[in-house]
Swiss-Prot record:
One of its GO terms (cellular component) is cytosol. Disulfide bonds: none annotated. One of its GO terms (molecular function) is RNA binding. The keyword Phosphoprotein does not apply. This is Ribosomal RNA small subunit methyltransferase A. PANTHER family: DIMETHYLADENOSINE TRANSFERASE (PTHR11727), DIMETHYLADENOSINE TRANSFERASE-RELATED (PTHR11727:SF7).
């Protein structure tokens, strides 16, 4: 049990959400994948699972009408909310001022597409201090947002996100399972992920057609021996690019053997160097094995000349 989150009574319920939306002339849109959480217990659960305390600096993507925002601020944390929809970004500070006025100084709102966010345009996260992402992500772009932020922010140390249940299962999938795929392996390059709970449809407005789940992620520390390759070093990203290229090729032709799927990238000797049987399929490889194969390709020269 986490005792760091006091129940202040300042969180949004269904009536609050609908009133705020009506006052601001806002309706949920499919374009931005908007489904607003209307249950205070759910947002407190998300924050509790994330382990947010007053010492944390939090990024939220897609704050919507502010349900989760207020739950994060309730802990005493400082946060930046990244919202793509201008009317919602404009409304959010007013909602915080109304329901939790003492927290307004701890909130920064950035009206921007999360896929375009960089340390340069979100200066609160531009230093080396670790931060956490806590979000109810738009289901149609959840995976691209996570991988983009992990690539651009070396100091994104952890996240707790709510996504479509099927997406959560894929993100946390392990080698050999039917749902293990590109998102699973690429996320494993950066750290470890697990599904930590499910969320029903009745806590949203409007109610989605799918169930949701929570995914918790912890990034590898720079000195963690489990970190594949140079995932958390200051390299120029070339090794990650090759590893991700291998992953895309292997899962783009999922039923083919590695030898067939990677024939334009990996020379035959690379498999021998890496100790990987080329008759295996990509769905059986761990991120460590993809990394070992990338290193072997580099030792053989230009992978584009594979025969």
């Amino acid at each position: 049990m986490n005792d760091t989150i006091p129940a202040t009574g300042h969180l949004l319920g269904a009536a609050d959400i609908r009133r705020i939306a009506a006052d601001a002339g806002i309706s949920p849109t499919k374009k931005f994948g908007q489904n607003f959480v209307i249950d205070p217990g759910t947002v407190r659960r998300i924050v509790r699972e994330a382990g947010v305390t007053a010492a944390n600096h939090v990024m939220e993507v897609g704050p919507g009408l502010g349900s989760l925002t207020l739950a994060i601020l309730e802990t005493g944390a400082t946060m930046t909310a990244v919202e793509i929809d201008p009317p919602l970004a404009e409304r959010l500070p007013g909602t915080v001022a109304e329901f939790m006025p003492e927290a307004t100084s701890r909130l920064t709102v950035v009206n921007r597409d999360a896929l375009t966010v960089t340390p340069e345009n979100v200066p609160d996260f531009s230093d080396d201090a670790s931060f956490t992402l806590v979000a109810n992500l738009p289901y149609n772009v959840a995976t691209p947002i996570l991988l983009t932020l992990l690539e651009r922010f070396d100091n994104l140390g952890s996240f707790l996100v709510m996504v479509q249940k099927e997406v959560a299962d894929r993100l946390a999938a392990k080698p050999g399972s039917k749902i293990y795929g590109t998102p699973s392996v690429k996320l494993a390059w950066y750290g470890t992920a697990e599904r930590v709970g499910t969320i029903g449809r009745n806590v949203f407005w409007p109610a989605p057609n799918v169930d949701s789940a929570l995914v918790k992620f912890t990034r590898y520390q720079a000195d963690d021996p489990a970190a594949p390759g140079t995932a958390n070093s200051t390299d120029d990203g070339t090794q990650r690019e090759l590893v991700f290229r291998l992953i895309d090729a292997a899962f783009g032709q999922r039923r083919k053997t590695l030898h067939a799927a990677l024939k334009t990238i990996a020379p035959s000797e690379a498999f021998s160097i890496a100790g990987i049987d080329p008759t295996r399929r990509g769905e059986t490889l761990t991120i460590a094995e993809f990394t070992a194969l990338a290193k072997a390709i580099e030792s053989c020269g230009d992978g584009d000349e594979a025969q």
